[in-house]
């Protein structure tokens, strides 16, 4: 057995999301169909539950497994306080594909894709397991001064719309 060359496995980042699933096998299939995920690892236990799996979405790896050992899925908890942000070349196309595959669109301003003041176009989905994803495309690179001005303009407009 060779000693590890790095403390971070090849292809991983120093922070890697690890999602607990109600049905990891179905989630793996859905992430492939809806988000174009590539399955890198899939380790079912003797009972057929997924003990560990890894997928690549874009340039990032996400780990996942079925509920076990006290781990609870977003579905079991009624949602997740954490969300995932996915940058792609065409957020509108991937958004439509994910919705066609069974994602739901949350209510509010981060639902259907729209241009945002910080230079992204993005929209939100909730996957069948209950995890929220923002699907985004960077449209403009802003200077700090441009971003600050746009933020001020946005919040003034938002405050006026609430009266």
Where are these predicted regions, by residue range?
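Short acidic-aromatic low-complexity motifs
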Residues: 21-25
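Vicinal oxygen chelate
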Residues: 2-18, 28-126, 135-163
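C-terminal catalytic core of tyrosine-transesterase DNA break-rejoin enzymes
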Residues: 129
């Amino acid at each position: 057995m060779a000693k590890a060359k790095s403390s971070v496995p090849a292809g991983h980042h120093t922070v890697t999301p690890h999602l607990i699933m109600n049905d990891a096998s179905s989630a793996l299939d859905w992430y492939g169909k809806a988000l174009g995920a590539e399955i890198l690892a899939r380790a079912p236990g003797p009972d057929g539950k997924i003990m560990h799996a890894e997928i690549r979405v874009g340039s990032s790896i996400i780990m996942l497994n079925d509920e076990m050992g006290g781990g609870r899925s977003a579905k079991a908890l009624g949602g997740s306080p954490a969300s995932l942000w996915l940058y792609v070349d065409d957020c509108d196309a991937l958004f439509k594909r994910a919705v066609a595959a069974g994602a739901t669109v949350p209510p509010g301003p981060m639902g259907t894709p729209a241009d945002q003041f910080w230079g992204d176009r993005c929209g939100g989905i909730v996957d069948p397991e209950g995890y929220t994803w923002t699907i985004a495309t960077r449209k403009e690179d802003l200077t700090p001064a441009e971003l600050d001005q746009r933020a001020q303009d946005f919040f003034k407009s938002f405050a006026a719309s609430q009266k």
